[in-house]
Amino acid sequence: DKAFGIVSSSGRNIYVDGMQDYRPIGAFSFLGRYRVIDFPISNMTNSDIDRIQVYINNKPRSVVEHVGTGRHYNINSKSGKLQLLFSEHNNDNDIYNTDISCYLDNMESLSRMYHPYVVIAPSYMVYSIDFDQFLHTHIDSGADVTLLYHAVDNAKEAYLTCNVLGLNRQKGVESIEPNHGNKKNQYVYMDTCVMKTELFISLIKEAKNLSSMYTLTDILNDKCETLDIRGVAHKGFFASITDFPSYYAANMALLNYKSAQELFHENWPIYTRTNDSCPTQYFNTADVKH
């Protein structure tokens, strides 16, 4: 009961052409079996995080239908709970529809959480991680905030809508900035972090006072000098779904058996809602391609 989980919605800089007009990225079909949001929720429930808040900015229907009460994610039915939370004031100008505005609209629900720590993960990135281990690494280090990052060597042509971390030799975070595509080796920030709930709430309030356009990443970047913010490296498969090419590439990459092994582990199930429908029949004249 040390931490509760937050699954955040995608930022205003992220847009998957042709698909996001109808549903949020978390509700996108993935590998023909899952939805993208299954990965962060399964990571949390596998890590014994039983209280989870899923934030939805717009077009909630498909996420609500898929996630529902969350029973299919193996959440403890007595002590656990999955909440779907919405932004009350969806602004016409998208620049103000930030994660901070969504948290502010649901401050009452946040304030009621009795857990000392909060683990935040995005609904638009695909990876496997033991959040319990991540939380203990954070507590043992004595840092104020711990951010998860993935080291990549193709940042010039990929991850262009992601943020990257500036790290010192001790893995202290000096900056969180947009990836400008000017360097191939970068530490991509996975929009995943852990901190004390108390600090999280105070950062939300401070961001609100600074600017209505501020995101959690913006306020964390401001705090790099005054707070002890550290980075922890993620190993294994990682995909950030922030535009159509990255969505296609993530699905295709997992046709590779080695990549699939990095994401799916025998003792780390990815839960999803099952829909029992008639199986597809392929006849002699069918032409099927990947």
Model-predicted segments: where are they?
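Left-handed beta-helix
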Residues: 1-9, 198, 208-290
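A short, N-terminal amphipathic alpha-helix
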Residues: 33-54, 66
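N-terminal nucleotide-binding beta1-loop-alpha1 segment
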Residues: 1-31, 42, 47-49
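A conserved hydrophobic position in a structured secondary element of the catalytic/binding core
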Residues: 58, 121, 195, 242
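Short internal beta-strands
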Residues: 53-57, 148-150
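Conserved core of the sugar-phosphate nucleotidyltransferase
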Residues: 128-207
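Acidic donor-binding segment of Leloir-type glycosyltransferases
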Residues: 61-84
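Conserved beta-loop-beta/alpha segment of the NTase-like Rossmann-fold superfamily
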Residues: 81-164
